């Protein structure tokens, strides 16, 4: 053991040395610390330097020792404990000091200045306008400083050892101190901006300083304080301007407040150590805060919040005003944009409250969207992004939740890329969301809110939200392209639900402006899913339409080639459809002749009603064929616009539906119905600026450039009829079709000018397999005739011919049965003028005979061009206007196999063809709803003036919409 001990010791020493060597400082460190001399400097110099440093340190320490405070001071500063006093006394003194400090802090917090005072002293950053209003004294608020003066006892509460410490916390006198006494706005409310950080109160007696006034800070304009729980949290909201102003508190009130505060203070100040105060002399601690300073702070907070809100509202209004001023000449600012059709669904964000306001005529009509629509959803991008400022571009990006960083070019590219993603189908013209919808030079764009149309128009079936903007563009071809800002394609193949807007009915409001123009809401099912819808222009009310003739090139993006191809396809489809219609018309005519032979006077009357109803259906369909390309703004070439006067087979029949109102500018009161046919003819033969007069007397001037030279020829040759004549396809031979003869309610000459003669009766029957008569159809006819006899429209001896093919593919016959002559004309009968096929010249005479015999009233002959309506027309018109059927015609499924005569008390007699067997046609795919697919769901919201029930879906399929 003794031998091992030295060895173990050596090993331990070695390990320690080794560890120290590893941890020793480098020479550089030793030199820097002055422990070792530098290698390059002599050792003597190093020693001298070290001695100097030691002497300096010694002198410093000596000075500190000499200047250190006395023990009493250290005891007072609580650095040293007081040994002379009793320990119990020391403990009590400490407790008392702490309690006093807490009381002082509580008082300062309770009497802290309110947000208004902080704003006035530049402590609280707010917007300059708000700050100016507060400082200048526009807003009066109760000042907490009024009641914040201290009693003379405030310093007495401090122990003798504490003066310096408390004084250090005292408020620092500020140069703006005098401002505290300025009359500060008094108001009943202030924002929740409570300021926690209070500057300590001055202990000196009578001193009223609250805030250590800091040099004025430039107010951060976008950082109004939003306060929670008495703490200031600056947020990015702009502070509102001040609108409420209260009377400044009178000096007497202020003095009363200060006295009250002084009375409440002594509760803590008078307490010295364990002094006893009887309960009756004790004062409620909570009362003073609520009564004086705390209540004032709450008032200031409420007032401040109100001011912020008002300021924000004012700023928004000013910004909107500025944008509105800039909109007229320049692209709209994003804030004033109303969502356009180019934005997919967000474009439906127009608030209904703002839509009606846009109905005011004028180029800025759309610009007057109320601010409620502001910033709701991004609208269409302005065309001139390059001209916009970076701030505007960033605002556009923010509206679309896109990043706003980058150069101007990057911002523009980002916006355009986003717009490309959300823009509608290429063929759809983009209706600018800007205030004025501008079109190309040759076009007139009529924009109006869908909400104005929804009351009586067919827009309801189109799925248009009332808030959407509807833009109708009358192109140079005379075609009206109708686009809604909503991009969702209407799914319903519902036939035209004619809007009663132009009928002058009490239910039609001036907002219904384009009601008649927009008879067929179905747009996207026809040729392409574009939000554009083609409109039949029937007298629109100028009041609700904003004609912005200014050209805006938003519509220039259409692919010309694609448009031409689609136009060709549409023409072919329309031609084929018209041929089928002609066949149906011929079949109907043959049936009517047979019926007339069997029941000479009676059959004539029965056919007339069918014909009228049917013609009304045709009217709705044919106008489309005639130059109204419904899908994606297809414009039918002028070849189809050929003179409608001549029954040239080329031009699709333009249905001249004149519903009791001559289209002439001087519309008689009875001629209140501007029929879709008029709009159709107008579109086809676009005449120079056309004045459309509605029954209400409102005038809409549509300047449409006409590319079809043949268009000028009016069927009746009376140029005075601006709408109906220009394009009235009424062939000369069937004079009854002349647009000028609106009084002929029973027939509107469809003048379906087909390229081939209508097939014979046998051929038509063979082509239509399911045209065999149904027993139920004859039963329905009997019911119809019974109703007619009861109403006195036909003679009692009138009976329906026993044989009436019920399944005939020409539902037109059934559709025509909404007899215009019935006292309660159904929406089907609302189109009094049926369009008999041009091929049957004798039919008009029979119809006239029937009408004259059944009503005893003379009919207006086809040659009659005078504007004065006939008594029969007046009667029909008055019936139509007075009939609730115009408004309330429930949708009914169409069955080609049966003729449903569903006399409904509210809607009068409405003929609904239920299409039971849709040969090779699956309407269910197209039906927007309903068990069978109501081809003509005449919704109560959008009653139709004529029924499309006569159309068979066999060949129409998707093109059903186009025939509207």
UniProtKB/Swiss-Prot annotation:
The modification Phosphoserine is found at residues 41, 159, 174, 191, 349, 351, 355, 358, 371, 423, 484, 487, 492, 496, 520, 530, 544, 548, 605-606, 651, 687, 718, 724, 728, 810, 826, 840, 892. Residues 41-58 are annotated as: Intervening spacer sequence 1. The modification Phosphothreonine is found at residues 352, 360, 485, 488, 494, 822, 842. Residues 85-102 are annotated as: Intervening spacer sequence 2. Expressed in heart, brain, spleen, lung, liver, muscle, kidney and testis. Changing residue 48 to A/D: Induces a nuclear accumulation in unstimulated cells. Residues 552-600 form a coiled coil. Residues 186-197, 497-508, 764-779 have a biased composition (Polar residues). Residues 215-224 have a biased composition (Pro residues). A motif (Bipartite Nuclear localization signal) lies at residues 62-100. Transcription coactivator that associates with the serum response factor (SRF) transcription factor to control expression of genes regulating the cytoskeleton during development, morphogenesis and cell migration. The SRF-MRTFA complex activity responds to Rho GTPase-induced changes in cellular globular actin (G-actin) concentration, thereby coupling cytoskeletal gene expression to cytoskeletal dynamics. MRTFA binds G-actin via its RPEL repeats, regulating activity of the MRTFA-SRF complex. Activity is also regulated by filamentous actin (F-actin) in the nucleus. This is Myocardin-related transcription factor A. It comes from Mus musculus (Mouse).
